[in-house]
C-alpha cells in the first residue's frame, strides 16, 4: 500500500551536503564516525507523520506514493530544505568585537548573543555570517521507509518518542480516548511542556482520538530515584563550593 499524507511511518535516513559530509543521521555508528553524535539523541529511526511538517518539505513530499521497505535518495534544493541564505544576516564588524583575535574564515564566533561563522577577513574588518549553517545548501537524503504504524499504541509511542526522546511511555487507549502516563521526570521538562499541546493536536487530527488524558504517574520507585538524583546534585554542588 502506497504511503500517503497522514500516515505514521518509521523512517531511517542520512542527510548529506553536496560534498558528501553528513549533517544528520538516524544511524548511531555513522553519527559517531562523522563526529556528529549527540548522546541525548534518539537513534535507530524516527517516527513521523507524512505531511505534518516533521521533516523538511523536500523529503516529506518524496515520501508520498512510496511503499514500505522503499530505499532511495532525494536531492533537495535550499527552498525545500532549510531555506535560502538571508543576506541581511551577513554583517561586517570591527575585529575588536571578537574575543579571539586569531580570526580566520570558518571560525565560529558569538557577537551580541548571536552565533555565526567568519566568512571573510579584510584588515581590521570581519564579515560574519549569522545564517544557519544549513541555510542556502542543497542537500540529499538517503532514506528507508521501515514500517507503517497501524495500532493506536504504536502511533502514540512513536509521536511521543519524536517529541520527548523517550521510547517507552505507558499508554492506554479505548473508545477514542488515550491515557498517557507521564513519568515524573518529564513533568517539568521544558521540551515536553512546549510539545504536549502539539502532540495532542496531531493525535486529534491524524489518529482520530476525541480525548487525550495526560496523567502524571508517581510510584515509590520513581520517587526514590528522583530523591537520589536530587541528593547527588546537592552533593555535587556542595563539593564544588570554594572553602572560606
Regions found by a protein language model. Give the residues of each.
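FKBP-type peptidyl-prolyl cis-trans isomerases
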Residues: 1-244
Amino acid at each position: 500500500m502506497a504511503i500517503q499524507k497522514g500516515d505514521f511511518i518509521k523512517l531511517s535516513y542520512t542527510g548529506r551536503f553536496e560534498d558528501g559530509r553528513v549533517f544528520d543521521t538516524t544511524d548511531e555508528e555513522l553519527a559517531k564516525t562523522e563526529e556528529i553524535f549527540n548522546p541525548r539523541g534518539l537513534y535507530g529511526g524516527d517516527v513521523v507523520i507524512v505531511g505534518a511538517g516533521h521533516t523538511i518539505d523536500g523529503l516529506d513530499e518524496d515520501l508520498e506514493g512510496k511503499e514500505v521497505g522503499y530505499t532511495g535518495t532525494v536531492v533537495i534544493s535550499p527552498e525545500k530544505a532549510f531555506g535560502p541564505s538571508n543576506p541581511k544576516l551577513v554583517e561586517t564588524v570591527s575585529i575588536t568585537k571578537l574575543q579571539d583575535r586569531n580570526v580566520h574564515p570558518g571560525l565560529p564566533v558569538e557577537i551580541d548573543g548571536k552565533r555565526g561563522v567568519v566568512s571573510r577577513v579584510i584588515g581590521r574588518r570581519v564579515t560574519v555570517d549569522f545564517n544557519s549553517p544549513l541555510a542556502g545548501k542543497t542537500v540529499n537524503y538517503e532514506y528507508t521507509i521501515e514500517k507503517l504504524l497501524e495500532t493506536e499504541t504504536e502511533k502514540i509511542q512513536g509521536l511521543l518518542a519524536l517529541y520527548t526522546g523517550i521510547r517507552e511511555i505507558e499508554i492506554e487507549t479505548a473508545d477514542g480516548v488515550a491515557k498517557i502516563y507521564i513519568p515524573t521526570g518529564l513533568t517539568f521538562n521544558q521540551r515536553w511542556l512546549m510539545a504536549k499541546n502539539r502532540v495532542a493536536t496531531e493525535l486529534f487530527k491524524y489518529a482520530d482520538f476525541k480525548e487525550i488524558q495526560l496523567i502524571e504517574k508517581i510510584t515509590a520507585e520513581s520517587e526514590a530515584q528522583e530523591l537520589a538524583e536530587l541528593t547527588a546534585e546537592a552533593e555535587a554542588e556542595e563539593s564544588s563550593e570554594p572553602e572560606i
